Swiss-Prot record:
The protein, known as: Large ribosomal subunit protein uL1
Annotated family: Belongs to the universal ribosomal protein uL1 family.
Statement: the UniProt record of this protein carries the keyword Repressor: yes
InterPro entries from the UniProt entry: Ribosom_uL1_bac-type (IPR005878), Ribosomal_uL1 (IPR002143), Ribosomal_uL1-like (IPR023674), Ribosomal_uL1/biogenesis (IPR028364), Ribosomal_uL1_3-a/b-sand (IPR016095), Ribosomal_uL1_CS (IPR023673)
Length: 231
């Protein structure tokens, strides 16, 4: 059996196996256990009572977190005319059409979110092999193909997170950073859970939100007592 590192021992001593933590207590403990030299993200994993093998039970959406994620988000927008001006005014980092597509084909992909107006999809459609593997392909299901590109830019800049169930029916997303106020983190997670409940597939039976786990980038996962959340 491999020996535990000093950090792993310290973590093991602080965590109670099998315990469900009050959210605020969990956030405080994760912050205490974060000893790495960079600002770790705080992530949530939500196990949903869905069968992801069934297309009508794949949960995919986006949520604007009330307090953002603490990350700087770079946004590119495919649109033209007045919508282009509106996107720039809303804070887009780059707006274009064929010129932007050419840049991306050449390898300029330093963006976290790519948004497109419906009339721009003729250009974006050529970028499937470039944007798809990076999870950047605009999609109407998560609000990144929309006539209102300015609002989509504002949402992205405000800390909108996008997610979909993995093969095990679990949603993974960042909800903040170590050092965030615990109450703000809690409100971010509550907003996410409320959205997940709102889009619950009609064919999903039994318990829907089965388990919520909070973790840091390099740290342990703590199971959250759902009774400590207002969602």
């Amino acid at each position: 059996m491999a020996k535990l590192t000093k950090r792993q021992k310290a973590i093991a001593e602080k965590i109670e196996a099998g315990k469900s933590y009050n959210f605020v207590d969990a956030a405080a403990l994760l912050t205490e256990l974060s000893t790495v030299k960079f600002s770790e993200s705080i992530d949530v994993a939500v196990n949903l009572g869905v069968d992801p093998r069934k297309s009508d039970q794949v949960v995919r959406s986006a949520t604007v977190l009330p307090h953002g994620t603490g990350k700087t988000v770079r946004v590119a927008v495919f649109t033209q005319g007045p919508a282009a001006e509106a996107a720039l005014a809303a804070g887009a980092d780059r707006v274009g059409m064929d010129d932007l597509a050419a840049e991306m084909k050449a390898g300029d992909l330093n963006y976290d979110v790519v948004i497109a107006s419906p009339d721009a999809m003729r250009v974006v459609g050529q970028l499937g092999q470039v944007l798809g593997p990076r999870g950047l392909m605009p999609n109407p299901k998560v609000g990144t193909v929309t006539p209102d590109v300015a609002n989509a830019v504002k949402n992205a800049k405000a800390g909108q997170v996008r997610y979909r169930t993995d093969k095990n029916g679990i949603i993974h997303t960042s909800v903040g950073k170590v050092g965030f106020d615990a109450v703000k983190l809690k409100e971010n997670v509550e907003a996410l859970i409320a959205d997940l409940k709102r889009i619950k597939p009609a064919s999903s039976k039994g318990i829907y939100v089965k388990r919520i786990t909070l973790s840091t980038t390099m740290g342990p996962g703590l199971v959250i007592d759902q009774g400590s959340l207002e969602a």
